[in-house]
Amino acid sequence: MKFFLLLFTIGFCWAQYSPNTQQGRTSIVHLFEWRWVDIALECERYLAPKGFGGVQVSPPNENVAIYNPFRPWWERYQPVSYKLCTRSGNEDEFRNMVTRCNNVGVRIYVDAVINHMCGNAVSAGTSSTCGSYFNPGSRDFPAVPYSGWDFNDGKCKTGSGDIENYNDATQVRDCRLTGLLDLALEKDYVRSKIAEYMNHLIDIGVAGFRLDASKHMWPGDIKAILDKLHNLNSNWFPAGSKPFIYQEVIDLGGEPIKSSDYFGNGRVTEFKYGAKLGTVIRKWNGEKMSYLKNWGEGWGFVPSDRALVFVDNHDNQRGHGAGGASILTFWDARLYKMAVGFMLAHPYGFTRVMSSYRWPRQFQNGNDVNDWVGPPNNNGVIKEVTINPDTTCGNDWVCEHRWRQIRNMVIFRNVVDGQPFTNWYDNGSNQVAFGRGNRGFIVFNNDDWSFSLTLQTGLPAGTYCDVISGDKINGNCTGIKIYVSDDGKAHFSISNSAEDPFIAIHAESKL
């Protein structure tokens, strides 16, 4: 009996690393700045049937409404209260979305902004998404309520009160991140208010949280908050399920704060992943795809079972956050599809796909002066995500998750889940291939010359549909067909000028 009890407790201890997705669903998508009503529809009409595991939603709590510049995306990272009331929708719409998505097996993960409230320079008043009064100057947030006692002003030792030196781990945690009022997370009252907010979301039915700015919180303070959280709603989750936790920690090396400091609380965002993969696919600094043979921990990344991975995120696709110029985004569509394809085929980490909106980029001295621009809107009201006849999105919503090449690789990852990384091939340059056991195989040509070779796929004999160039529809293939012989070998030809210079086949794409 002791043995069973031990297993029982271990199961609960490890729960925050598990994404709580339905069996066979292995990726989530960040529907950045989408309205709750559009997410609910997308769960039903697209995400569920296409095998997506869940959605990371933008912060659902009340934030400052900023008009200079006009309604920037980053206003949502400046909380005013924990009321569920934003440009994405109100609490009723949020509840409706969570219910409808869970009912079709698609989970909701909340971007939780709990390190801070709004900036200290914001004017007092009711310029907030729900009309709540707040006064940053006097540290007064009556809608929570928080007062001057609940902030770290007294603990911060820098002259400005802001973080001035990232080599000082204490000020990174106890001072203000770019002027944002830093909550005193060691106080039980503050921890309780945050846990109350997160428990409200858990009770509604969310499956987990991205913890924004985790690097700026002490790991022990995060743990104290997590220890107060409810189990997930048993309408949709097994009894005793814990919320999935992934912490935003930017650790590119060279600073005292390490991702590993946070492993006790949950997974961490591995920012090295997209930065390095972008450098490789762009072939910068002499990097080659052949070097990806030991991708993952071999590149100095966090352990696979602690990693939340992505090619780009809402910050670094516009030059914020971490990764710099190497980050690939939808603006670099051809290379981007290859990078996302590689990520979704490779077993390392838990994968998140980005879904963006277009904005008018304007570079001056190498910087995008429009990096602040918020989502498509009419006078500040977020525009509907319209769906075009060809299944792409309108109204300047990019919907990368609907691109055939990306959607089909989300399915590929589901099909090969649990299979080993096998049958690696490289030409010493930028032509590489690998398999996932006997369930899938993928080939890339990122060289400036064509690729034509017979490779061992590890797959059963038969005719397969390449899910990059087309789809398997009613037993037919709209793209390239690949013939695997009895010995598991197949011939692949990929021109370096192909629209998408990669091919992927899997057990479910067999004709």
Curated annotation (Swiss-Prot):
Stored SMART domains: Aamy (SM00642), Aamy_C (SM00632)
Known outcome of mutating residue 248 to A/Q: Reduces activity
Pfam families: Alpha-amylase, Alpha-amylase_C
Outcome after substituting residue 212 to A/N: Abolishes activity
Effect of residue 210 to A/Q: Abolishes chloride binding; strongly reduces activity
Outcome of swapping residue 315 to A/N: Strongly reduces activity
Disulfide-bonded cysteines: 43-101, 85-130, 156-175, 393-399, 465-477
Catalytic activity: Endohydrolysis of (1->4)-alpha-D-glucosidic linkages in polysaccharides containing three or more (1->4)-alpha-linked D-glucose units
Residues at the site labelled Transition state stabilizer: 315
Subcellular location: Secreted, Extracellular space
Tissue: Detected in pancreas (at protein level).
Free-text cofactor note: Binds 1 Ca(2+) ion per subunit. Binds 1 Cl(-) ion per subunit.
Family: Belongs to the glycosyl hydrolase 13 family.
Quaternary context: Monomer. Binds to the sea anemone inhibitor helianthamide.
PANTHER family per the UniProt record, alphabetical: ALPHA-AMYLASE
Protein known as: Pancreatic alpha-amylase
Gene: AMY2A
